[in-house]
A protein has these predicted regions:
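Non-catalytic cap/lid and distal C-terminal segments of serine-dependent acyl enzymes
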Residues: 1-155
Length: 155
């Protein structure tokens, strides 16, 4: 597998952003996945206080992915809650809309198919994963690990 640290200019946020990507070993990929631009992708969103490095520093993600055919994308969003707000930056647009387009330029073999596109997150990232998955048609599966899913609800 290969590990990429990418810094790109986010037009949506008006600043440089960072994203880490784990790309599967070519020997693990099928010819159809490569030829059809159909490598599955998982977006992993960090929690509050985290960044694009959190999943690698705090989990065994690389060991778990050693023999898979999955691209894993780990962006940084500061404390943006993966949300567009009136007084803050449009982090929802940056992650849900802009980032997949940016990554497709770097990784043209990454799938565009909903059934092979997944999203998950921890805490704040769990909230973001559900918010993005439920408000777009891009993701077939979503997971929230200790996500703050009841924000704004009474009791």
């Amino acid at each position: 597998m290969a590990f990429f640290k990418i810094e790109y200019n986010s037009k949506v946020l008006g600043m440089e952003r960072q994203v880490n990507v784990i790309y599967p070993d070519a020997s693990e990929l099928t010819a159809a996945e490569v030829d059809d631009n159909d490598i599955p992708v998982l977006y992993l969103l960090h929690g509050m206080g985290g960044n694009e490095n959190s999943w690698q520093k705090r989990t065994n993600i690389e060991r778990l992915l050693r023999h898979t055919n999955l691209i894993v994308v780990m962006p940084s969003t500061d404390l943006g809650w993966y949300t567009n707000t009136a007084s803050g930056l449009p982090y929802y647009d940056a992650i849900a809309i802009e980032l997949p387009r940016v990554l497709k330029r770097f990784f043209p073999n990454m799938t565009n198919k909903r059934e092979k596109t997944f999203i998950a997150g921890l805490s704040m990232g769990g909230y973001g994963a559900y918010k993005i998955a439920l408000s777009t048609d891009k993701f077939s599966h979503a997971a929230s690990f200790s996500g703050a899913l009841a924000m704004g609800m009474d009791g």
